[in-house]
Amino acid sequence: METNKEVALKVLKGAFIERDATVVDRYFSPDYVQHNPVIPSGSKAIANLIPTLKDLSYEIGMVVAEGDLVMVHGRYVGWGPKPLVAVDIFKVKDGKVVEHWDVMQEEVPASATASGNPMFTPA
């Protein structure tokens, strides 16, 4: 059986890099609970979203897994007018994503941060 970390990464790669809607049947619970304010709950909402993401690119950064939770730091380009840096949090049960939260913020270039450090570093 795949680890929870492997499940979350396959979901993100399948949905946002490969645009493969079959990840929904393989890795999402039918009763999937979504906490993003613009995406409805239910695996069908994700299946409907994937084909609309033609101009999206996604990069994976840090990944942390603890118990049934997996957090992935990522960068989305093409979701909105500016690149977004996000943390996606997945709850995984029996190899299926059962719940998801995310926090997204417009990316600030390293040259404009107080520290001079970037908000996102690819894996």
Specify the residue positions occupied by each region the protein language model found.
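C-terminal and inter-domain tail/linker signature
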Residues: 1-123
